[in-house]
Amino acid sequence: HNSCLNCEATVTVGKRNGLTVVPGMELCTAEDAHTICLFPTVADAMEFHQYVKQHSPVMNNDAGTFGTQIIMNDSDEPIGEETQLLINAANIGIDDVVALVNQYHGAAFPAHIDRSAYSVFSTLGAIPPEANFKAAEITHYADEVCLLREHAELRDKILLRNSDAHYLEHMLEPNAWLALPECTPECLIAALNGEIDITWK
């Protein structure tokens, strides 16, 4: 969370294997609501990373308690360590995220909204209209029909079903597809910003 330091290696490995990787960050907002921030390039992602770092509490990571925050290269080898603790909330309000991420040519949407912790619903009870999100992420456990019934603000948003996996073995098998004019980060970001019409099934 709150870091893009492994984006470059991940994008490089993706290119090597014929995969389109979209660099991004799972931001923890001031409200403790996790938010996905995606960018067209690693350079944009790293500029945003620096902004978030400058607007986060300066606190050293306790590796014994929270684990080592390892930076990897594209050969899956450790090349460094982030010493600033990354799990804390950044001093960035949820109402400001979309406009801020747009400044770095990206798109943002609330993460795992159906989870009982660190989601916009668990912390705020609803998605603030001022936040101007065009999409939202739900987990594979979510009852989409129930969510749409209970939260009217979701009915005009793209709902992306993801695993919220922190380990490879927890990643879902693909069960949905997104029809984009081009298989590029730029095209996905345009769709998530509501700039082009898409089909998501």
Write out the residue ranges for each language-model feature.
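Short low-complexity stretches enriched in small and charged residues
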Residues: M59-T68, N88-D95, H112-Y118, F133
